């Protein structure tokens, strides 16, 4: 009997040993909410070694950088909406709307509940500008027609008001004037920018960059009004709250500025900033967000108070420009940190996102642009064309998503 007992105990030990190996070999579950620039980077980097699940409302990635050109070159539309179907070899996508994110699970609109070992919140932001087709436009034809309609309105317009003179507003000017140059009197547009700040593009640009962008606008006969603002109509405010598209139609109106100026325009583009997609996390993480809804994170992109929950992109409270470059950097950091945590690395040894001096590359049409690297290096059209203006990173992100078939 002792002999049989010893065999039984030995078999139990062998079973427990192999069970522990199996548990150790099980892939950790990484749940990523949102698949923009940063979210897609995390998903791609962790796909081989983790059980990756991405939750997305849309079935295509939206290349917002290139979208400003699509409003005058609608044939680009099918290239800036990139299907996700080739991004992951092992992981999976769940297409749906997240209604609640908590420290232990994520709830979807259809009732599904998802758990995780590591959570990456990459919900991003939206804007009022006409560069993004409404969610219900899902086929290539529908998306093309959306941009074609806007391009026709811009073609008809004689005077265009750009409300907001940040980088997006200035890039829009570059695209419109490249398409309708001032020397073509029949098609040329009278363009006015109204900007609430004291200089165009960003408060982080140096004096040389500021002088160059002012000269560029002057050369293009663009009227620039600084330190003033247009009162946003109620219907536009509602669109901003609901994240729906305003009615982009040519219609001659007079707009009053806060300082009392009257501006006549028949087409308006609102580039007044972004709205964070914070609804899903703001309830359960109310102590971890700041007054504008950004999530408080440490240098490893971990949400304040949590080792296994991360935030990246526009929704972080990093004191930096919200750029594609920084979103991709966040993605790289989070992927490395998750790998290190799963390997038992000490939290003091984790990778950290470095807050770098601003890198600003401004496209002003396919052949022109301005670039500032760090706080003291400025470059003109040649470098800007290489970095951004020529292709607006269309090829870069087609490759990033493994060159899927275009939308049909």
UniProtKB/Swiss-Prot annotation:
Annotated GO CC locations: cytoplasm; lipid droplet
Protein EC: 1.-.-.-
UniProt KW keywords: FAD, Flavoprotein, Oxidoreductase
The keyword Oxidoreductase is assigned to this record: yes
Residues bound to FAD: 34-38, 69, 314
Cofactor or coenzyme needed: FAD
Alphabetized SUPFAM superfamilies for the sequence: FAD/NAD(P)-binding domain
Keyword Flavoprotein (UniProt): yes
One Pfam family hit: Pyr_redox_2
InterPro entries (UniProt xref): FAD/NAD-bd_sf, FAD/NAD-binding_dom
Any one Gene Ontology molecular-function term assigned to this protein's record: flavin adenine dinucleotide binding
Function, in words: Putative FAD-dependent oxidoreductase.
Family, as annotated: Belongs to the FAD-dependent oxidoreductase family.
Record's protein name: Apoptosis-inducing factor homolog A
Species annotation: Dictyostelium discoideum (Social amoeba)
Name of the encoding gene: aifA
């Amino acid at each position: 009997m002792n002999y049989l007992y010893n065999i039984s105990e030995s078999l139990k030990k062998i079973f427990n040993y192999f069970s522990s190996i199996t548990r150790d070999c099980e892939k950790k579950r990484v749940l990523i909410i949102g698949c923009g620039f940063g979210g897609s980077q995390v998903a791609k980097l962790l796909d081989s070694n983790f059980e990756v699940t991405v939750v997305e409302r849309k079935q295509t990635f939206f290349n917002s950088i290139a979208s400003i050109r699509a409003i005058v070159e609608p044939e680009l539309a099918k290239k800036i909406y990139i299907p996700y179907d080739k991004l992951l070899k092992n992981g999976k996508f769940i297409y749906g709307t997240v209604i609640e994110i908590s420290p232990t699970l994520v709830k979807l609109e259809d009732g599904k509940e998802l758990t995780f070992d590591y959570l990456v919140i990459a919900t991003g932001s939206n804007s009022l500008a006409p560069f993004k087709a409404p969610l219900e436009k899902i086929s290539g034809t529908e998306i093309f027609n959306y941009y074609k309609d806007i391009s026709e309105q811009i073609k008809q317009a004689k005077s265009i008001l750009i409300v907001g003179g940040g980088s997006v507003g200035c890039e829009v000017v570059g695209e419109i004037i490249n398409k309708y140059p001032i020397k073509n009197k029949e098609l040329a547009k009278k363009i006015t920018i109204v900007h609430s700040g004291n200089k165009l593009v960003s408060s982080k640009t140096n004096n040389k960059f500021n002088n160059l962008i002012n000269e560029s606008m002057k050369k293009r006969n663009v009227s620039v009004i600084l330190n003033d603002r247009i009162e946003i109509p109620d219907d536009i405010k509602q669109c901003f709250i609901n994240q729906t598209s305003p009615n982009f139609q040519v219609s001659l109106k007079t707009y009053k500025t806060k300082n009392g100026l009257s501006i006549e325009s028949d087409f308006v583009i609102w580039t007044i900033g972004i709205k964070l997609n914070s609804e899903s996390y703001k309830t359960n993480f109310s102590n971890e967000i700041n007054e504008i809804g950004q999530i408080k994170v440490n240098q490893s992109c971990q949400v304040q108070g949590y080792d296994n929950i991360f935030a990246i992109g526009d929704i972080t409270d990093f004191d930096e420009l919200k750029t594609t470059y920084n979103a991709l950097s966040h993605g790289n950091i989070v992927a490395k940190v998750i790998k290190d945590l799963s390997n038992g690395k000490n939290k003091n040894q984790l990778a950290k996102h470095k807050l770098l001096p601003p890198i600003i590359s401004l496209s002003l049409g396919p052949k022109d642009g301005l670039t500032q690297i760090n706080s003291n290096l400025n470059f003109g059209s040649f470098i800007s064309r290489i970095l951004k203006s020529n292709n607006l990173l269309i090829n870069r992100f087609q490759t990033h998503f493994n060159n899927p078939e275009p939308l049909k």
